[in-house]
Amino acid sequence: MSALVLDGKALAAKTEQELSQRVTALKARNGQTPILATILVGDDPASATYVKMKGNACTRIGMESIKVELPSSTTTEELLAKIQELNDNPNVHGILLQHPVPHQIDERLCFDAIAPEKDVDGVTCLGFGRMAMGEEAYGCATPKGIMRLLEAYNIEIAGKHAVVVGRSPILGKPMAMMLLNANATVTICHSRTRNLPDLIKQADIIVGAVGKPEFIKAEWIKDGAVVVDAGYHPGGVGDIELGPLVERAAAYTPVPGGVGPMTINTLIYQSVDSGEKKIR
C-alpha cells in the first residue's frame, strides 16, 4: 500500500484562502491589514528571490508588505537602527531579517534586536526559549510549518520516537523542542553522531534536516515510519533517499511540495496572527 503524501503545497493553498478571509475581515472592521517588513541586506540573488516570494505571498492574501533593502556595506549598527525603527512603528506587525547577512554584520545580535511580538520568523533567542518552555511564542517558520503539516494530516506524535537529523538553530534544534512539547520522545543526531543508521532505524518519525542531498538512506528507515524531509537540493532531491519509501512508509513529505511551501505559509500565518493581536 502506498504511503500517505503530506502535501504541503495543497495545505498552504488552503490556508491562504483562510488567511485571506481573516485579512478581509480585519480590514472591514478596522480599515487596516497586517504589515510584514522584510529586510534584505546585500544583493545575493537567492535571498532576493526568497524575499520576493514572501512579498508575493502577502499580496495573495491581501496583506501589505514593506521591503527594506540595504547595501552590502551596511554595518551592524546601521542594521540595528533600522530594526529599531521597525520595532517602533506601530503599523508594522512582523519583521523578517533575511538570512544570511554580509559577513561584517553580527547576525545573531541583529536577530535578537527584533521585538519578540514582531518575531514572526521565530529567530530570536528569547522566542526560542519561550517556545522551548512551552510558553506562547512564534516558532521558527520551517519547523513550525512541519508541525502544522503533521497536525493537518492527523499524524500521531505523542508517545512516538522522533529522530531529528540536524541541529541548526533555525531548524534542527527548534524542531526537536516542538516535537518534545508535543510529547514525542526525541533523539537529536548530527555530524558526529555514532551509529547513525541504527538510531534512525528506531524512528517512528524521522526528520531530515542535515543539508546534504540524500544523506539519509532509505534502508535505514523502518517500514511504517513517518518521513519528513526538510531539505531541497538541485535535481529536486532532499536530505532523504525517498524513492523506495513511497511504498513502505506510513507517510512522507514529497520534495518539492512538502515542507517548502509550509515555510513561507507559516511566516504569513504568524504575521496575520500578530496583526490580529495589535489592530483594534
Curated annotation (Swiss-Prot):
UniProt-listed GO biological process terms: L-histidine biosynthetic process; methionine biosynthetic process; purine nucleotide biosynthetic process; tetrahydrofolate interconversion
UniProt keyword annotation of Transport present: no
Pathway(s): One-carbon metabolism; tetrahydrofolate interconversion
EC number: 1.5.1.5, 3.5.4.9
Catalytic activity: (6R)-5,10-methylene-5,6,7,8-tetrahydrofolate + NADP(+) = (6R)-5,10-methenyltetrahydrofolate + NADPH; (6R)-5,10-methenyltetrahydrofolate + H2O = (6R)-10-formyltetrahydrofolate + H(+)
UniProt keyword Transferase, yes or no: no
Gene3D superfamilies: Leucine Dehydrogenase, chain A, domain 1, NAD(P)-binding Rossmann-like Domain
Any GO CC annotation of this UniProt entry: cytosol
InterPro entries per record: Aminoacid_DH-like_N_sf (IPR046346), NAD(P)-bd_dom_sf (IPR036291), THF_DH/CycHdrlase (IPR000672), THF_DH/CycHdrlase_cat_dom (IPR020630), THF_DH/CycHdrlase_CS (IPR020867), THF_DH/CycHdrlase_NAD-bd_dom (IPR020631)
Keywords, in A-Z order: Amino-acid biosynthesis, Histidine biosynthesis, Hydrolase, Methionine biosynthesis, Multifunctional enzyme, NADP, One-carbon metabolism, Oxidoreductase, Purine biosynthesis
Record-linked SUPFAM superfamilies: Aminoacid dehydrogenase-like, N-terminal domain, NAD(P)-binding Rossmann-fold domains
Function: Catalyzes the oxidation of 5,10-methylenetetrahydrofolate to 5,10-methenyltetrahydrofolate and then the hydrolysis of 5,10-methenyltetrahydrofolate to 10-formyltetrahydrofolate.
UniProt family annotation: Belongs to the tetrahydrofolate dehydrogenase/cyclohydrolase family.
Subunit structure, as described in the record: Homodimer.
Protein name, UniProt field: Bifunctional protein FolD
Species the sequence originates in: Cellvibrio japonicus (strain Ueda107) (Pseudomonas fluorescens subsp. cellulosa)
Gene name tied to this protein: folD
